[in-house]
């Protein structure tokens, strides 16, 4: 047999639970909407970085694998120019072209500024003799091949500039691929 009193109490409990669930979802959506609707360029940049870039470059630009560059600590001007080059087709990379599709110039500037403000990565030490050769070429170049010192353009500490990328802390495998 059915107990009308028990059914009424259960119905009230379900209604209360449903109201609380709806309220929690609404509050969560409001909080997400506030972040998504923000006019603060750093918030916008962080949202774009998380949604479009983090899978390959990590949420803070530290890179998730050696074949992807670390973006943290690059200058905003350098990153902006690179993203604009992908958007215009001047720089070719299918994945990057897709990722920048639909970003406005201010979105590109926002994500570039976000990554520029992140702490640059650090690459653990490796083979000391090989590091010594690399340091020599970086500081003095290779006169046999005509390669000028990397430091001439990228700076003594490899921090890069508004025109050239930061090399310090970059994944060695990524640098090798770019040089070749």
Placement of each model-derived feature along the sequence:
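Short, Lys/Arg-enriched N-terminal segments with co-localized hydrophobic residues
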Residues: 1-9
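Bacterial N-terminal signal peptides that target proteins for export
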Residues: 11-22
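Bacterial N-terminal signal peptides
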Residues: 20-30
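Electrostatic cytochrome c docking/interface patches
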Residues: 33-49, 62-67, 116-144, 165
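The feature marks the first
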Residues: 41-89
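The canonical Cys-X-X-Cys-His
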Residues: 52-60, 111, 147-157
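Axial heme c-ligation environment in periplasmic c-type cytochrome domains
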Residues: 64-70, 85-127, 161-166
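An amphipathic alpha-helix signature
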Residues: 76, 80-84, 105-112, 172, ...
């Amino acid at each position: 047999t059915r107990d009308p009193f028990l059914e009424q109490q259960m119905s009230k409990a379900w209604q209360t639970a449903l109201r609380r669930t709806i309220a929690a979802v609404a509050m969560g959506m409001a909080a997400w909407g506030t972040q998504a609707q923000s006019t603060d360029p750093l918030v916008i940049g962080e949202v774009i970085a998380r949604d479009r870039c983090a899978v390959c470059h990590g949420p803070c630009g530290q890179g998730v694998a050696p074949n992807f560059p670390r973006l943290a600590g690059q200058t905003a001007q350098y990153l902006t120019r690179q993203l604009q080059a992908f958007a215009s087709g001047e720089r070719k990379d299918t994945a990057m072209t897709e990722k920048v599709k639909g970003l406005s110039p201010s979105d590109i500037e926002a994500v570039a500024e976000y990554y520029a403000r992140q702490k640059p990565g650090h690459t653990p030490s490796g083979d000391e003799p090989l590091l010594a050769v690399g340091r020599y070429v970086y500081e003095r170049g290779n006169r046999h091949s005509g390669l000028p010192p990397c430091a001439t353009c990228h700076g003594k500490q490899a921090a890069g500039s508004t025109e050239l990328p930061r090399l310090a802390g970059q994944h060695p495998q990524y640098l090798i691929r770019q040089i070749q």
